[in-house]
Amino acid sequence: MKLFITGVNGFIGTHLLENILAKTDWEVDGFDIASTNLAPFEGESRFAFRKGDIFKDNEILEAEVIKADAVIPLAGIAKPAYYIKKPVWTFELDFEQNLKMVRLCAKHGKRIIFPSTSEVYGMSGDTELKEDESPLTTGPIVKMRWIYSCSKQMMDRMIMAYGQEQNLQYTLFRPFNWVGPRLDTLKDAEERQARSVTQMLYDIVYRRKISLVNGGEQRRSFTWIGDGIEGLMAIIENKNKKADGEIFNIGNPANNHSVKELAELLIDEAKKFPKFREAAEATELDIIPASAYYGKSYDDKQNRLPSIKKMESRLGWQPKTGMREMLYKTIAWYAENEAK
């Protein structure tokens, strides 16, 4: 099998590439605007990288789609800070540029495996979020945070529409707070542009207070990147075509914790590392309103708990990694690679 992956330099892209090269005989053509995380893959005979801009390099993108058996468009914005500060760019990249990829796959009869997001469920009132049943409800227009959710939801609908009208072969997957090495850089965290785990770890390492937006009572289902990638691999493999035309949540309901609990667990795990112990023991939690941290256009969902029955029944996938193990392994990577 030959895959074309955009955004291959990113968090999911690098972990997926690593897994493919280690466990399969598949070939990968990768495309991204940067290659900062790809040094370990230099010289791999089954991996070819093309540096480029998804906004501009249309001929390259089409040529790569034509060569591929399946396309995985991972290029996109997935950081809440950007939804607020750069909403137009968020829409242009997450919807407009990725719609271009969908249309190329439909035009050339290629399978697309597309990253939706748990954010599409928005403010859904369902306790357990189900792919084909839960309503997708977002907040008012003045809450700019929802532009990402709406962009992704519209993309899901367009992909399904192309499947209906032009027989596009597709699968959508919805990651629920995947965590692990390379989630963000500590430089991102220094600029307050990182996601929760990396931001908190930065605050611990550099002896800053951990900010708990609105008290950190929001609950999320945190998922080890390795477990998430195993689920994604099952989708790509697509045994007996059981993934065709389906949407799958990929998350870990057993790791459903509040953001405050996440901070407390991260501090506890950081204490196990001699280089971080003193800083972790001194770390304080600081409760601040969302408006002070993100601005007035922020909004949030109080709990996000996935149903993974579909992944279990159709593809035989279940997450394996508990919360403490996941955080320990994540801290260990940053201790070795970034927090020198």
Model-derived segments and spans:
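Rossmann-fold cofactor-recognition segment
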Residues: S45-K56
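C-terminal substrate-binding subdomain of Rossmann-fold SDR/epimerase-dehydratase oxidoreductases
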Residues: I204-K340
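A conserved pocket-lining segment of Rossmann-fold NAD(P)-dependent short-chain dehydrogenase/reductase
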Residues: Y83, L136-K143, F176-D188, S196-T223, ...
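N-terminal Rossmann NAD(P)H-binding glycine-rich loop of SDR-like oxidoreductase domains
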Residues: L3-K23
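Active-site "gating" loop of Rossmann-like NAD(P)-dependent oxidoreductase/epimerase domains
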Residues: I77-W89, E96, K110, P115-Y148, ...
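Active-site Tyr-X1-5-Lys
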Residues: V142-T171, I204-Y206
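Conserved glycine-rich Rossmann-like NAD(P)H-binding loop of the short-chain dehydrogenase/reductase
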Residues: D25-S35
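NAD(P)H-binding glycine-rich loop region in Rossmannoid oxidoreductase-like domains
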Residues: I54-L93
